Amino acid sequence: MPPMLSGPMAAILLGVAATRLAAPAATVDEPAASSEAPVWRLAWHGYAFLDSNRQDGPSGGRDFESVNHAMLVATRPLGAWTQSLLGTFSIEPATIAPEGSPLLFQRGETYGGVLLIDKQHAHDLFGQLAAEWTRPLPRGTSLRLYAGLRGEPAVGPVAFPHRLSASEFPMAPLSHHNLDSTHISDDVVTAGFTASIVTIEGSLFHGAEPDENRWDLDQGALDSYAGRLTLHPLDALSIQVSACRREEPEALEEGNQTRVTASVGWEKRTAGGFVAALLASGKNELEEGPEWGSLLEAAWRFRTRHVVYGRVERVDRDVYELVNKQQRPETVEPQRTAVDGLTLGYALTVPLLREASTSVGAAVATERFDDRLEPVYGERPVSVWVYLRFGFGSTGGTAHQH
């Protein structure tokens, strides 16, 4: 049954004609393949991993799963404006186990009212349902407006499902909930202004994380806010700093949360493919103190068919939660520890399907952590993914940043 449209964002979207907005913050995937219609220009983009996921050690697990993503954009001129309708979708609620995909040291969201530890939750069916407007102004400036029943507020770097440097990784970053977990938020309104190399954006949105039902929308008050400053000193270089204040974001944690992020991204197309990298760090301000997550990731496609990629991360975790696999009670003193992660992978494009770009790949990951965690994680776990990746669209479903 389709979700009911109600609340403040429904009023905005149903009462206003749509246009091409500066998307969730500074970046929206521009779908690749397109077809011309009398008024609207339609474009689409998508990818799907089919992978065998083996997480090592006593806290590990195994699964056969599919991480996937699709986006549809309809664009048309509307007077002085450009108008777009944006839809982003995933069928991960059907292709990933309800309790999430095995991923050592991951933390965030819930299943059955219990905090997910060593699991990456599935993304919602509706990742974005939004309208967007852009308008050029004098002296090389432009205005962007964005409104979505679900979308991405102006905080963080490009979310990992959409950025080129992460396009071949079959797993989420461990720092996801420090950097870009707001990429699926309910009831988002964003305004942005660009002058030369500078873009300033501000958002209002509903701060609570989506609930455990991954098939619906979760509407609420515009109770949270975000802002971002982005610089593009070179076509390939993007620098952003951002912050947001979220009202009661976590189902199991009382209180509001402040997040601050900064990142430097590089993306360059080449004759044989691309080179892309991201250095990012984010901090969640919690009652027990700051919680940091940082990463450096890169991907290089060369000779058209070959991709090598890697990611280095450091994230803060709570010892009690990692040992007991549940939310730390307020009566237990927090014990923070740093976890370092390393992921390396390779993919090869193969001529399997005419309708899609297909690659076969593998990735390995290992972590360095506190000795106190060895009884529950082993001495040095080594996790492995082996996968097929299908990309749809004229660029093979490869994400990219604007």
Segments (PLM) and residue ranges:
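Repeated loop/turn-to-beta-strand initiation elements of outer-membrane beta-barrel proteins
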Residues: 79-84, 139-143, 193, 197-201, ...
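Outer membrane beta-barrel transmembrane domains
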Residues: 242-252, 275-288, 293-299, 305-353, ...
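Residues on the lipid-exposed face of transmembrane beta-strands in outer-membrane beta-barrel proteins
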Residues: 46, 70-76, 129-135, 189-195, ...
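Beta-barrel outer-membrane channel/assembly domains of diderm bacteria
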Residues: 26-136, 381-391
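Surface-exposed coil loops of outer-membrane beta-barrel proteins
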Residues: 97-230
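Transmembrane beta-strands of outer-membrane beta-barrel pores
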Residues: 48-56, 89-95, 147-153, 195-197, ...
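Residues that define the transmembrane beta-barrel architecture of outer-membrane proteins
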Residues: 40, 62-70, 123-129, 183-189, ...
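Outer-membrane beta-barrel "beta-signal"
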Residues: 344, 378-402
